[in-house]
Amino acid sequence: MAAVGPRTGPGTGAEALALAAELQGEATCSICLELFREPVSVECGHSFCRACIGRCWERPGAGSVGAATRAPPFPLPCPQCREPARPSQLRPNRQLAAVATLLRRFSLPAAAPGEHGSQAAAARAAAARCGQHGEPFKLYCQDDGRAICVVCDRAREHREHAVLPLDEAVQEAKELLESRLRVLKKELEDCEVFRSTEKKESKELLKQMAAEQEKVGAEFQALRAFLVEQEGRLLGRLEELSREVAQKQNENLAQLGVEITQLSKLSSQIQETAQKPDLDFLQEFKSTLSRCSNVPGPKPTTVSSEMKNKVWNVSLKTFVLKGMLKKFKEDLRGELEKEEKVELTLDPDTANPRLILSLDLKGVRLGERAQDLPNHPCRFDTNTRVLASCGFSSGRHHWEVEVGSKDGWAFGVARESVRRKGLTPFTPEEGVWALQLNGGQYWAVTSPERSPLSCGHLSRVRVALDLEVGAVSFYAVEDMRHLYTFRVNFQERVFPLFSVCSTGTYLRIWP
C-alpha cells in the first residue's frame, strides 16, 4: 500500500506562486518598486526604503544614519498619501526588513508566455510610470492637469503647484463629472418637456390655422357668391332696359310707318287732284283739302326722352360700383397687410445697471446689485428701464411680451426723448404709455390716476402700435381679448419700453 504524502500538483504550485507574488508586493517599496532595503515607516503607517524617502525629501545622505539626525523640524508630505510626516519620527521596520531578506533568498519562476497578461497589459503598466524617473504615478498636479510621480512632486517645476493623491484627484474628477451629468440630465429633461410642449403648441397652431383656412375660404366663397348675385342683378337690369328700348323702338317705328303710309297716300291724291282739269279740280279741291285737315300730325314717343334717363341711372350705378370695388380692394389689401409683426431685441446701451439682459437680448430681469457698466448718455441711470434697439415713426406694428406672474413689471412704448437721467414718473406726460402689474392688479398707466383692468391672469400680451391713427393697444394673446388702448398724437419716433423693478419677476420678448 502506497504511503499517502502531501498533495502536490499544478493547482497547489499555482496557489503558492500567487501567494509568493502577493507577499512580494507587500514587501516592495512604492518608490523604487524593489524589495525593501532598510525600510522605515512614517507616522501615517506607510513604509519606504530609507534611501528612497530621503531622495524624495531631498535630504542629502538620507541613506546614512547620521543624515536622519539632520532632518528638518517641519513636516513633509508622505510620498504615497500626502499626509504630513515629520522626518525626525522615521521608525525602522525590522519585520518588513526580515520579510524582504527572506524573499531575496527565493526567486519566483518566470511567467509563461501569456500567463500574466498580454503586451497590452505590459503597455498599460509602462504608461502608469513616470517616463523621466521610472516611478509609478501616485500624484496629480492640478496646475498642469497631469499625473506625476513622487520625485516629480519634489522637483522645482511642481514645488508651488497644487498636488493631490491620484485617487483623490480621480474622486474629485468623478464628482465633478457626476455634478455635470446631473445638470445635463436636468437640461435634457427640460428639453424633453419643451419639445413635448412645442409639439403640443404646434399641433394646436396647425389646427387653428386649418380652421382659419376654412374660415377664409368660406368668407371669400360667400363674397364671390354675393358679387355673382349683384353682377346678375345689374346685368339683368341692363338686359331689361335693352328689351324696353327695342320694344319702344319697334312701337315708334310701326306708328311712324302707318303715318308715313297715310301721308304718302294723301300726297299722291293731292298731286292727282292738282293735275286734273280746272272744273274737276275745283269740284274735288274742297274734299281733298278736308282730308288733309283730318290727318293727325306725327306724335311718336321718342326713345331718348325716357330710356336715356334709365340708361343714365344704370351708368351711374356702374360708376359708383367701380369706385366702391376699387376702395374695397385697397381697404382689404391694407387690412391684410397692416400690423406686420416686428422682431425686437433689447438695447444694452439703454439698460439700467441693475437690469440683467439675456444673451439673446430678448429677456430682462432685475439683479441684486448694479453692474459696472459704461455711463452711456442713452442709459437709464435711476429708473430700472430698457428700450428696444429699434424705434418707429410710421406704419402699423405689433409685438408680443411674455410676462412674469409676480408684481414689478411694466411695458409699452416711450417717445425717443424720454428722460434717461434721474427719477422720472411713469406717466403719459413723460412720454410713456404702458401696462403694469402692481399690487396684484393689472393697470393701464393713465394720468392723473391709473386705470385698473378687469382681466384674468396674463401670460402673454400683444402690443399693437398704429402710428397712422395714433393708438397703442394691448391684447391678451390667449384669446385676443382687448385690454386697453391709448390715444396718442405722436410727434416723434417711439420705442418699445420695458421696466422690471422686482427680483421676483421678469419680462421677455416672445418668442
Curated annotation (Swiss-Prot):
Residues 166-263 form a coiled coil. A zinc finger (B box-type) spans 125-166. Changing C501A: Complete loss of interaction with GYG1. GO terms for cellular component: cytoplasm; Golgi apparatus; nucleus. Changing S499A: Complete loss of interaction with GYG1. Zn(2+) binds at C130, H133, C152, H158. Keywords: Antiviral defense, Coiled coil, Cytoplasm, Golgi apparatus, Metal-binding, Nucleus, Phosphoprotein, Transferase, Ubl conjugation, Ubl conjugation pathway, Zinc, Zinc-finger. Changing S107A: Abolishes phosphorylation by RPS6KA5/MSK1. Reduced ubiquitination activity towards RNF187. Forms homodimers. Interacts with GNIP2. Interacts with GYG1. Interacts with RNF187 (via C-terminus). This is E3 ubiquitin-protein ligase TRIM7.
